[in-house]
């Protein structure tokens, strides 16, 4: 997703007033740094519109990822509402997450790393995500946000738990790991600092 309105809309769905989050950009190339590298920056909710503006200064990049759980507001000082080459600078760790707001389920076709999915593989992943959504809905789960990554699909369930939840989210993700099959890999992303693509 590179459209400014779509990025802003997604971030406003994921975060709320007072939140701080990290944006990470893979294989970025800028006028100042011509080799592919990772860019990282911290943004607060009040400056969400600065994210697409920061992306505009990059000449190219492969993907944009965001920590969907809010981080310690002190981390904003690392790169205030801007991107910078990550280099040896620290990025978000699990201990930097202040609250769990999302449970992520990633459905991707099984394929070699770096290879895009075929149309049939992509549809298979979308069908698997729809099936999981339907199964969980029948168990009383709410409707998730479902996103299409272009290769697969991701389900995002709103939760409200402390960052250190005693392993509750991990236990939940382990219980549903059986949904993987020969064609589609299901990854329940339980680590609190896990990021997701902005597609």
Give a label for each model feature.
Residues 1-151, 158-181:
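Signature for HUH/AEP ssDNA processing cores
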Residues 174-199:
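Flexible helix-coil linker/hinge segments at domain or subdomain boundaries
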């Amino acid at each position: 997703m590179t459209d400014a309105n779509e990025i802003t809309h997604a971030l406003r769905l994921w975060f709320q007033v007072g939140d701080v989050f990290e944006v990470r950009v893979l294989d970025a190339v800028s006028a100042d740094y011509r080799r592919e590298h990772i860019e990282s920056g911290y943004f607060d909710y009040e400056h969400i519109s600065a994210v697409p503006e920061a992306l505009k200064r990059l000449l190219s990049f492969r993907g944009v990822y965001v920590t969907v759980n809010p981080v310690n507001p002190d981390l904003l000082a690392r790169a205030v509402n801007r991107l910078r080459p990550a280099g040896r600078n620290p990025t978000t760790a699990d201990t930097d997450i202040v609250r769990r707001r999302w449970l992520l389920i990633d459905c991707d076709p099984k394929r070699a790393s770096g290879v895009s999915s075929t149309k049939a593989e992509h549809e298979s992943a979308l069908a698997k995500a729809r099936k999981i959504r339907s199964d969980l809905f029948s168990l009383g789960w709410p409707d998730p946000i479902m996103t299409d990554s272009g290769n697969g699909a991701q389900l995002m369930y709103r939760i409200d738990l402390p960052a250190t939840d005693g392993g509750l989210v991990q236990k939940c993700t382990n219980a549903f790991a059986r949904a993987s099959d020969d064609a589609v890999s299901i990854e329940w992303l339980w680590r609190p600092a896990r990021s997701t693509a902005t597609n």
